[in-house]
């Protein structure tokens, strides 16, 4: 679109569309940045609507901001330095990611949702309108609120992704283990590991618990 600015070491994949007044690949908004040669990588088939702002990475964060394939990014979205986004993500108008945020495949961030730095937004999760998120979000979980809290499983999203009723039921069981059983986190993880032996859809919960460095919404 007209008046788009693409600057810095920025790579844009095939069939990606950028609409007017977007700023793509500008210097990171980080006081530690001192002109280093960092980059922004955007994958294929991604839509970037009007007035979006995407920053390059910082040396301290690995030097790259990465946005995957088939993402739908609506107007006025901000993606800060060193964020890593997977594929098939939806970010609605004015959603914002602070630095070093990771977003998993198929996550949905509703309008005006704000994600604090270093958070991990799990795959297939749903962040409701105007939620303020300062902890990581496990896979499959819906969160909502000015101080975001877990509200259940994103069942509608899973149905749209082709999960069958049995798979969705197992995800709900895993949610109850983590959120309603009263088990300590270590005990809940052991139970999830046992469930994952027969139900592969539980595996993302365990991977999340093993890899997320920030406290998560529980």
Sequence positions of predicted segments:
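Structural signal for interior beta-strand "rungs" in well-ordered beta-sheet cores
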Residues: 1-149
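Terminal amphipathic alpha-helical/low-complexity segments used for targeting or macromolecular assembly
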Residues: 15, 21, 32, 37, ...
């Amino acid at each position: 679109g007209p008046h788009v600015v693409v600057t810095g070491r920025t790579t844009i994949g095939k069939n990606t569309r950028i609409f007017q007044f977007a700023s793509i690949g500008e210097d990171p908004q980080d006081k530690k940045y001192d002109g280093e040669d960092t980059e922004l990588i955007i994958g294929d088939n991604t839509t970037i609507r009007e007035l979006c702002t995407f920053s390059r990475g910082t040396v301290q964060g690995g030097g790259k901001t990465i946005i995957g394939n088939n993402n739908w990014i609506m107007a006025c979205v901000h993606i800060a330095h060193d964020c890593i986004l997977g594929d098939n993500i939806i970010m609605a108008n004015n959603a914002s990611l602070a630095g070093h945020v990771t977003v998993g495949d198929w996550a949905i961030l509703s309008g005006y949702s704000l994600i604090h730095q270093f958070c991990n937004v799990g795959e297939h999760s749903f962040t409701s309108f105007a939620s303020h998120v300062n902890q990581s979000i496990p896979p499959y979980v819906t969160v909502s609120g000015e101080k975001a809290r877990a509200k259940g499983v994103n069942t509608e999203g899973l149905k749209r992704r082709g999960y069958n009723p049995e798979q969705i039921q197992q995800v709900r069981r895993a949610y109850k283990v983590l959120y309603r059983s009263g088990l300590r986190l270590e005990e809940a993880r052991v139970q999830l590991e046992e469930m994952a032996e027969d139900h592969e859809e539980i595996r993302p919960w365990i991977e999340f618990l093993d890899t997320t460095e920030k406290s998560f919404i529980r």
